[in-house]
Design a protein with these regions (language model features):
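Class I SAM-dependent methyltransferase SAM-binding "motif I" and its flanking Rossmann-like core
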Residues: 136-140
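Generic structural signal for well-ordered alpha-helical scaffold segments
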Residues: 17-25, 48, 52, 85-89, ...
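Short beta->alpha linker loops
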Residues: 7-8, 38, 104-107
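Ligand-binding beta-strand-loop-alpha-helix segment within the catalytic cores
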Residues: 56-130
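Glycine-rich N-terminal segment of FAD-binding domains in flavoprotein oxidoreductases
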Residues: 26-52
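Non-catalytic beta/alpha edge segments that cap or flank active sites
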Residues: 3, 14, 18-19, 26, ...
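N-terminal glycine-/serine-/threonine-rich phosphate-binding loop
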Residues: 1-32, 110
Length: 140
């Protein structure tokens, strides 16, 4: 584990985006673990800027998100799938079929969680995980 101290949110976003993009350049078919919420928004903006400039290619990348709200489908504007589509996936050249968010509307949530764990294992694990830390101390 490596800790990087930064002076402000913009610097954090720039450094986090650079690390993620470096991972993609180093391993074009990498698996990224992604998070939602306000913490990663700046990072996602910086990634989108780099992608728009042609500095990084996400076409072979897979993503696995942390979580989803139970009872919300991906078209609901409060869902994490909607958040990711709006704030990152539609702004970079990632194959949407390689973006994974748990199904919050699954009939059997335990089976959905087990299938999601299997997906992570079948993907070879997560190469780089992005997490946020909230003001209340939560991580995720």
């Amino acid at each position: 584990m490596n800790f990087i101290k930064v002076n402000n949110y913009d610097e954090l976003s720039t450094k986090a985006a650079a690390l993620i993009c470096a991972q993609v350049v180093m391993k074009p078919n990498c698996v990224l673990g992604l998070a939602t919420g306000s913490s990663p928004l700046g990072t996602y903006e910086k990634i989108a800027e780099k992608c728009a400039k042609g500095e990084v290619d996400f076409s072979k990348v897979s993503s696995i998100n942390l979580d989803e709200y139970v009872g919300l489908d991906g078209t609901n504007d409060q869902s994490y799938r909607y958040f990711m589509n709006t704030n990152l996936f539609t702004k970079i050249n990632i194959d949407v079929t390689k973006t994974n968010v748990p199904n919050g509307c699954a009939a059997d949530l335990k089976a959905e969680c087990e299938a999601y764990d299997a997906l992570i294992a079948q993907s070879g694990g997560i190469d780089l995980q992005l997490l946020g830390i909230g003001l209340d101390g939560h991580i995720g």
